[in-house]
Amino acid sequence: MSKKRRLFTSESVTEGHPDKICDQISDAILDAILEKDPNARVACETSVTTGLVLVSGEITTSTYVDIPKIVRDTVREIGYTRAKYGFDADTCAVLTSIDEQSPDIAMGVDKALEAREGQMTDEEIEAIGAGDQGLMFGFACNETKELMPLPISLAHRLARRLSEVRKEAILPYLRPDGKTQVTVEYDENGKPVRIDTIVVSAQHHPEITQEQIERDIKEHVIKPIVPAELIDENTKYFINPTGRFVIGGPQGDAGLTGRKIIVDTYGGYARHGGGAFSGKDPTKVDRSAAYAARYVAKNIVASGLADKCEVQLAYAIGVARPVSISIDTFGTGKVSEDILIEVVRNNFDLRPAGIIKMLDLRRPIYKQTAAYGHFGRTDIDLPWERTDKAETLKEQALALAKQ
């Protein structure tokens, strides 16, 4: 291998992974509340272990939802329906500990600092300050049609396929827990040229042989997903490399909401501000601003203004306007990054209320994002994945570049 060639690896997990169970429960509760009370404040955390689900957090709402029922329905849908799996939707204990949102935080969110200072009218913005300080990143690149890095794109598709072959009884001996990992080789120009390594770990019935699992995973999971032209005789496969994966899910490992933030985003290919998504209503900029940053980055790449783009947004609690906007095109930009920032400011309202309005976020759309990634999804329609501003950005940026 040439010195200039490099390898990059990303991983994904199935919906039955303990941390992902928690993300899905937290977002199922969020969706159920938003369906009845779109203005609710929700920060819902879930923990799972053998036979137990604990739901805690801060929720301020005018509605009632049956949290234990939502938990059991979600666990059942994932596929934990038998005690011998070590976790059963009908028999697991469900504990809840829910408080209201701190009034100190609510005060800052309810009426943004600028509005309190008289710099803005309530008509200009619904006066929502950021629910916390923090920094968020969005990223896009032209490695795939959905403008995502190839390693995480393939890892997600393999993980989703693992669940499909289980639920459709193509491989009925599989159980819900599983992980995937893909290593891509990039050439001297940074273009993906081949798959170096594929790792798949799939929980299974104890009677199935390792040989059958290897054969079936290659045939029914990897082959339909990974493009044949990226595979060669040197591609390495590690399928259940320990030789046995019977004990899994919450019986094998405890799980927590928000512990798969790299899986949820770009697989480590781009930077991450540290904030998790699931269980948070859209006034939490950890979630809404990360979605907005992806929306911005994707439209910049879709416009042809850059091959690769990373957007950073940062906020102060109670303050609506971002304290900073930063754009990095890694030397691939067709115009300067200053011009890109200017056209972004002109075309995207990146105040929390502006983001909520722009992306129509006060809706029950979140549970579907809680497994297999929040970005680059082609199986569901997500507003931050649209490229409706690409042409406008291109026209304005090129006009500014000529001045």
From Swiss-Prot:
Cofactor binding notes: Binds 2 divalent ions per subunit. Binds 1 potassium ion per subunit.
CDD domains with a match to the protein in the record: S-AdoMet_synt (cd18079)
A biological-process GO annotation: one-carbon metabolic process
Enzyme class: transferase
Residue ranges crossing the lipid bilayer per the database entry: none
Record pathway: Amino-acid biosynthesis; S-adenosyl-L-methionine biosynthesis; S-adenosyl-L-methionine from L-methionine: step 1/1
Keyword Transport annotated: no
Chief location bin: cytoplasm
Positions bound to ATP: 17, 177-179, 244-245, 253, 259-260, 276, 280
UniProt-annotated stretches for the region Flexible loop: 101-111
SUPFAM superfamilies named in the record: S-adenosylmethionine synthetase (SSF55973)
Database matches in Pfam families: S-AdoMet_synt_C, S-AdoMet_synt_M, S-AdoMet_synt_N
GO terms for cellular component: cytoplasm
A Gene Ontology molecular function term of the record: magnesium ion binding
PROSITE patterns attached to this UniProt entry: ADOMET_SYNTHASE_1, ADOMET_SYNTHASE_2
Known catalytic reactions: L-methionine + ATP + H2O = S-adenosyl-L-methionine + phosphate + diphosphate
Family according to the record: Belongs to the AdoMet synthase family.
NCBIfam families, alphabetized: metK
Cited function: Catalyzes the formation of S-adenosylmethionine (AdoMet) from methionine and ATP. The overall synthetic reaction is composed of two sequential steps, AdoMet formation and the subsequent tripolyphosphate hydrolysis which occurs prior to release of AdoMet from the enzyme.
HAMAP family reported in the protein's UniProt record: S_AdoMet_synth1
Protein name listed in UniProt: S-adenosylmethionine synthase
Organism: Geobacillus sp. (strain WCH70)
Organismal lineage: Bacteria, Bacillati, Bacillota, Bacilli, Bacillales
